[in-house]
Amino acid sequence: MPNLASWHPQIVHFAIALLCVGVLFRWISLTGRAAFTGPAAAVLLLVGTGAAVLAVKSGTDAHGPVERVPGAREAVIEHEDWGKRTRNLFLAVAALEILALGLARRSARVAKGLTVASALVGLAGGFALYEAGEHGGELVYAYAGGVGIRYGDTTDVNRLLLAGLYHSAQQARTLHDSARAAELFGELARRFPDDTTVRFLAIESLIRDQNDGRAALAALARLSVPPDNQRLRLRYGFLKVDAFLAAGRPDSARATLEQLARDFPDVQRIKDRLAQIE
């Protein structure tokens, strides 16, 4: 069977949707209302179980690189174990559904009992499915499991590094650790020197984390933005204003804002900043 690692997210989400709706329909069918829910539940549960089998296969194919990340192994194993429990429970559900379909004409009473059993086991399967999803989410969001390595593209890995440095720097700033924030934004700028957004962040850090308006002005002088890009021009202009203020040059900051107001007369933020300086 081919390696399904890169397909794990898609397969998992199909399995979750099919199995959740399948269990819901099976319980509705037991009420005797909405006759279509009985056959629909059988189809959804059988197809969903197939998806669960493939989800475990794709997850097993994907777990190697994720498990080797320091500190992630236990989270990977826990997610994998819940995934296997989910698969096994729904294999039991699928077996009950197949038996119920096979006995429907011979013994309606037995078939009914089998569908009740399917509904009960389906509840247990639903709990296991929730746990597998919860631990899968923890693996991705708390350990970056699989993030940036899905296709083996170095560009994706670099994006992961960029995101990690950015969030670490922002967290340091939130914790009022200016020295750490400045260090991380500086590292970001060293690793991604050609990224305009990163250069803006590094200049902002000179102002906010180091209170070095002169260095920020020097960095801005080396940065050019497209004249037809309003968003970048505004960001450049506001950073220049902040840099002038940090350097103790409020008159230059006001002159910069006045020029921005002439260039972008409809931007309320410029007017608000002018009012603050005045």
Task: Tell where the protein language model's regions lie, with residue ranges.
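Membrane-embedded alpha-helical segments of integral membrane proteins
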Residues: M1-L18, T49-G102
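Internal/C-terminal transmembrane anchor helices
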Residues: L45-G50, V110-H135
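Alpha-helical segment of the N-proximal tetratricopeptide repeat
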Residues: G136, G152-R191
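Short coil turns that delineate tetratricopeptide repeat
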Residues: R159-L160, P193, D228-R231, P265
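Residue-level recognition of tetratricopeptide repeat
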Residues: Q170, E204-R208, F238, D242, ...
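Structural motif corresponding to the intra-repeat A-B loop/turn of tetratricopeptide repeats
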Residues: L175, D209-Q210, A247
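TPR alpha-solenoid repeat register
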Residues: V198, R233-Y236, I270
